[in-house]
């Protein structure tokens, strides 16, 4: 996969691409990440990327020209692909695990990170394929949002995680929150690991994990159960918890 990031603050991404899982993914050639300062594509002596909005109003808007030309330039480097051009914007579709899995199937992603009051509307109308938000709040720019999406997508790529099952069993990947985890020691200052996890009976352990996953979802994110295909056993557990309230 190739990921292009367009930002007027490219140095913000060095910490993400130079550490941990993403660094290893780049070193192992599972993904190529290139960060471009789209200010370099702005016309004129001073390379200005923003201007006042027509009709008045507060703040400055990112101009269409630098971003259009920067996107065209990164597309020309990968002429064999048809990239998803992703605009990070609070008005976009809420990012979730399903979207991460969808993006992970692509060959080429281009992230546009904005600043100031917003974008010239022609960028939305004629350039981007996706508008993505990481939540109902405002940040100073799109860079942090792009980092979140990029991290979530890269860890899903084949060969990136050491254990191929890690991404499959994560919270949200199964539709439920993940079950509790424990490691050694079995007794830490009187706080003990559930006996069933020490039993060695894999069938019991799997059932315990399934039940705890469902219980955690029921208690913390009941909205996720609305369209979840429950088994008969899971329905019985839910009824027990509901009746005990």
Curated annotation (Swiss-Prot):
One of its GO terms (cellular component) is cytosol. It is found in: Cytoplasm. S-adenosyl-L-methionine binds at residues 114, 134-139. One of its GO terms (biological process) is tRNA N1-guanine methylation. One of its GO terms (molecular function) is tRNA (guanine(37)-N1)-methyltransferase activity. Keywords: Cytoplasm, Methyltransferase, S-adenosyl-L-methionine, Transferase, tRNA processing. Transmembrane segments: none annotated. Its EC number is 2.1.1.228. It catalyses: guanosine(37) in tRNA + S-adenosyl-L-methionine = N(1)-methylguanosine(37) in tRNA + S-adenosyl-L-homocysteine + H(+). Its main location: cytoplasm. Homodimer. HAMAP family: TrmD (MF_00605). Belongs to the RNA methyltransferase TrmD family. This is tRNA (guanine-N(1)-)-methyltransferase. It comes from Listeria welshimeri serovar 6b (strain ATCC 35897 / DSM 20650 / CCUG 15529 / CIP 8149 / NCTC 11857 / SLCC 5334 / V8).
């Amino acid at each position: 996969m190739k990921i292009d990031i367009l930002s007027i603050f490219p140095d913000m991404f060095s910490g993400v691409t130079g550490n941990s899982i993403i660094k290893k993914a780049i070193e192992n050639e599972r993904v190529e990440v290139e960060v471009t300062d789209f200010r370099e594509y702005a016309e004129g002596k001073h390379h200005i990327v923003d201007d006042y909005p027509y009709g008045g109003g507060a703040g400055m808007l990112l101009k269409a020209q630098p971003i259009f030309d920067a996107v065209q330039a990164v597309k020309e480097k990968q002429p064999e692909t048809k990239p998803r051009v992703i605009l990070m914007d609070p008005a976009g579709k809420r990012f979730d695990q399903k979207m991460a899995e969808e993006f992970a199937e692509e060959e080429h992603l281009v992230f546009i990170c904005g600043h100031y009051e917003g974008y010239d509307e022609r960028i939305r109308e004629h350039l981007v394929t996706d508008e993505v938000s990481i939540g109902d709040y405002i940040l100073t720019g799109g860079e942090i949002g792009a980092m979140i999406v990029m991290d979530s997508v890269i860890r899903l790529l084949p060969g990136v995680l050491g254990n191929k099952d890690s991404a499959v069993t994560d919270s949200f990947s199964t539709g439920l929150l993940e079950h509790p985890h424990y490691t050694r020691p079995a007794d830490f200052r009187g706080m003990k690991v559930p006996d069933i996890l020490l039993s060695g009976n894999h069938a019991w352990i799997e059932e315990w994990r399934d039940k705890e996953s469902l219980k955690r979802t029921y208690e913390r994110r009941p909205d996720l159960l609305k369209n979840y295909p429950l088994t008969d056993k899971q329905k019985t557990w839910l009824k027990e918890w509901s009746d005990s309230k």
